[in-house]
């Protein structure tokens, strides 16, 4: 079992931009950050249900396919689920509505909501007020030997990195400069010093960098 992170960031390290609204939950620059990933054949099939074979193939698609492999549970922050915008709506089921793309248990770190939310496709959201380490213990039990993903946002990922809980950190660096937002690397000087590193440039210009605690990338 490994703890994995996969994030899209800009050249200057921003994983989300300012100006988040209920209509644009990830901010106005989200499409620029994730455009290469969303365009892949794997993403279109796994998230949009597009079985036509449309979408890009190549390096970006290989990483998109790897993103979905071997995950048994996930941990995410309240903002990624949408609770910052809908804190008092008991009917809020996340940005994905009735068709979340996870198909495994997800721990949502929050003090705003409790209980569980189950879907017929195997996705379940478990709302818990926990530290990073305690959340990981719960996720490990739910993953049943498979890997655990720390899904985001960047503030949540930083907590896990600062506590040394991440085994594999993959960032897809989009060839754009945002100059604002939430920076993944804030306060993380030398956090990857004990990792090996692998990098690869995709046809889109996206640079995929993976830091790993062992030789498995």
PLM segments and residue spans:
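Enzymes that bind and transform nitrogen-containing heteroaromatic metabolites
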Residues: 1-217
């Amino acid at each position: 079992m490994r703890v994995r992170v996969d994030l899209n960031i800009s050249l200057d390290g921003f994983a989300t931009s300012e100006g988040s609204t209920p209509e644009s939950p990830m901010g106005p620059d989200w499409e620029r950050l994730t455009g290469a990933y969303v365009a892949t054949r794997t993403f279109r099939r796994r998230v949009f249900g597009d079985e036509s074979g449309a979408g890009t193939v190549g390096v970006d698609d290989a990483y998109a396919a790897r993103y979905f492999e071997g995950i048994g549970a996930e941990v995410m922050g309240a903002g990624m689920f949408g609770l910052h915008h809908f804190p008092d709506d008991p009917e809020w089921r996340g940005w994905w509505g009735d068709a979340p793309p996870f198909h495994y248990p997800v721990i949502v770190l929050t003090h705003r909501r409790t209980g569980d939310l189950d879907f017929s496709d195997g996705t379940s959201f478990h709302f818990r007020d926990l530290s990073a380490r305690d959340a990981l213990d719960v996720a490990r039990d739910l993953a049943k030997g498979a890997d655990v993903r720390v899904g985001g946002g960047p503030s949540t990922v930083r907590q896990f990195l600062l506590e040394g809980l991440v085994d594999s950190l993959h960032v897809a660096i989009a060839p754009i400069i945002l100059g604002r937002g939430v920076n993944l690397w804030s306060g993380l000087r030398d956090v990857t010093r004990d990792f090996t590193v692998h990098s690869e440039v995709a046809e889109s210009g996206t640079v995929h960098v993976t830091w790993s605690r062992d030789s498995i990338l």
